[in-house]
């Protein structure tokens, strides 16, 4: 594994701690090569933590010559752009690009998180959705979509091949901050606008 300093955090899937580590390195480290080696991890950690805005800001801070010469960073930026476009099909396609074995835990977790967030948005935004539309939003086959959604208590109407979502009640022990509320509302509105 290339990221020896954070290997334990990666194996425990503690992506918040990985993000904190990368932020500290960017601020405190004098070793520019170390910082450059972590840019991909840093960008993906922002995305895993659902912080697209800071991922975009980090992209702007990365030196242009390094961005242009590093194919892995270019591929990660493709993921950032696809998430920004709020088109799940494009996002799943960009997540299937092989960035390298060292990034596999990040890509796997990001895909799972993206799929879960999309599922929650569908659950709360739709009263009915076709299996094919839901399948493209979740990035899985229609058969797997039916299995997955019915396991979450959705109803499947075989005659019309539609699904009836069950709204998800978020259980939060703390109140969201203003930024979290704005981000959540923005995601919801963008998702609804994209689907019309």
UniProtKB/Swiss-Prot annotation:
One GO term under biological process is:
protein deneddylation
Listed under subunit, the entry gives: Component of the CSN complex. The holocomplex is comprised of 8 subunits csn1-8. In the complex, it probably interacts directly with csn5 and csn8.
**Among the entry's GO cellular component annotations, what is one?**
COP9 signalosome
Q: Return the Gene3D superfamilies for the record.
A: 1.25.40.990
Entry-linked InterPro entries: COP9_CSN8, CSN8_PSD8_EIF3K, PCI_dom
Give the chief site where it resides.
cytoplasm
Function text: Component of the COP9 signalosome complex (CSN), a complex involved in various cellular and developmental processes. The CSN complex is an essential regulator of the ubiquitin (Ubl) conjugation pathway by mediating the deneddylation of the cullin subunits of E3 ligase complexes, leading to modify the Ubl ligase activity.
Keyword vocabulary terms for this entry: Cytoplasm, Nucleus, Signalosome
Q: Where is the PCI domain?
A: 10-177
A Pfam family found in this protein is CSN8_PSD8_EIF3K
Q: What family is this protein classified in?
A: Belongs to the CSN8 family.
Protein name, please?
A: COP9 signalosome complex subunit 8
As for subcellular location, the record says:
Cytoplasm; Nucleus
